[in-house]
UniProtKB/Swiss-Prot annotation:
Family of the protein in this entry: Belongs to the bacterial ribosomal protein bL21 family.
Subcellular location: Plastid, Chloroplast
Keywords: Chloroplast, Plastid, Ribonucleoprotein, Ribosomal protein, RNA-binding, rRNA-binding
Full protein name: Large ribosomal subunit protein bL21c
One GO process term, biological-process aspect: translation
Length: 118
């Protein structure tokens, strides 16, 4: 737990560490056909990096920071059922929604030309 980074992706902020995997929303909006297994990913929206006792904060994002990773697979979250009904109006509507997620693993955190591994 010496090295971690906080990234901004999919409308949320994630705390990522090298060697761990995470689920991301809206990651498959790029093109679902290119997100096969072991597709390499670079994430440039890095908000903060903590390495040993050093902390690097960015004004919005860090300039020379990238997160290198690869997509393991894409999958759907559990289905949510939405049921709307108005009493005495005979109005009923049933909707379903499944969130599309991409599971990716962080290989390394790069900052100023240095790569930090687990």
């Amino acid at each position: 737990m010496n090295t971690y980074a906080i990234i901004d992706t999919g409308g949320e902020q994630l705390r990522v560490e090298p060697g761990r995997f995470y689920d991301m929303r809206h990651f498959t909006l790029l093109n679902p056909s290119i997100l096969d297994s072991n597709t390499k990913v670079l994430i440039y929206r890095v908000l903060m990096i903590h390495h040993e006792s050093n902390i690097a904060l960015g004004d919005s994002w860090l300039e020379d920071a990238t997160i290198k990773g690869r997509v393991l697979h894409s999958h759907f979250k559990d289905k949510i059922t939405i049921y709307k009904m108005r009493s005495k109006k005979k109005m009923r509507r049933k909707l379903g929604y499944r969130l599309n997620l991409a599971r990716f693993v962080v290989d390394s955190i790069c900052f100023d030309g240095k790569e930090f591994y687990k």
